[in-house]
Amino acid sequence: MPTGLKFNSSLSEANVVILCAPYDRTASYLKGTARGPAAIVDALKYQVETWDRYTGAIPSPGRKAALCELTKLNRCSPETMVKRVRREYEKYLGQAFILLLGGEHSVTTGALEALAARQDAKNITVCQVDAHLDLRPDDSDYSDSPHGAYAHSTVMRRAFDLGFKTLHIGTRAYAKEEMSFAREHGLKVFEWGSGPVPAAGDIVKAIATDTVYLSIDVDGIDPAHMPATGTPVQGGLEWYYTIGLLKSIFENKKVAGADIVEVAPRPY
């Protein structure tokens, strides 16, 4: 009875690429997200069962999966990091489904720049699960050493600037100016803790395009379920709700790519 997923394909033959971007230069609270990709991959290799009870099948039978890591990424400036992520993402775009593993949320901007260069961004909705809106123009308002337009708190503003539609799920911590920007531009925000939890189907119906890019910042999940993050916020999505939401999105939309970011492994 084997456990763990296998990554035994070459990158040139893979139709699933796990792109690891260990970066946390602009993290505004606790550090550690640079260790996130390695921890996730380690768990995938040695901890998870090969039988998936949600689908009743072995995950992605017939898929050829490969790992790719951007080495020494944490030495880069935010601008250089985004360029490196974009270049690597472009290599496999169109060949494989790419799951980007952060690292802090700023790594997502590189993936979105690659997508926007290849497809019409206005036909794609970036669906973000996140406690925060990440709509700041830069990080100068809260950082003593600001990192500019490519900080982790700016990723959805960069998505907007690139022409993507955006949808925010699990929001419960934001600046007044961020929410004003969202309302001014008609961005769809599903706040948590301000009323009843929305049905997953209602969120899917609110996605205005057939194609989505999924960005999962794990601080969007209730820290009672996901404590291993640098910016935990009380409340958030419950684990099984999150699984159901993702399942509904994959069943009803074309997912152009996805990322999981802001995992900061705890020293158990």
Locate the predicted segments by residue:
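Conserved alpha-helical scaffold segments that buttress catalytic/binding sites
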Residues: 1-268
